[in-house]
Amino acid sequence: MREIMFRGQTRRHGKKVNMRGDKLPGRWVYGGVLQGPGDFSIIYGGENLGDIEKHTVYTDTIGQYTGRDVKTGKVFEGDIGKSRDGIFLVVWNENNSAHMLQFYDPPAELLYLEEMWDDSEIIGNIHDNPELIGGGQDDA
């Protein structure tokens, strides 16, 4: 049976600062998901049924586990990867009802996730590292 899991971010990357003024990374939580009506949803999980933890996350940061693992860990929607053929983003494609690889460097057609090479690695994600695929940096 395929493992069903999601991840979501409890705060925006770099938005909250600590006492010294340093930016903090966004905190990722993993588990099941309850879709909220607005900007927020709930990620829940725990080791035991009696110990279920609930975390409010930004809905637009939720990504599903693809069922694929690489040497750097589990692969989720929104991950940015690197392979011998370039830099890619893991996306859900509605037309094909499948997780796919959208290449940015160099630009190319979408490839099915199953075509991911064994030497591929995850180097970031669209929320924490948009600059890896040409996205803007948020200095706030």
Identify the residue ranges that each predicted region occupies.
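Secondary-structure transition motif
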Residues: 1-140
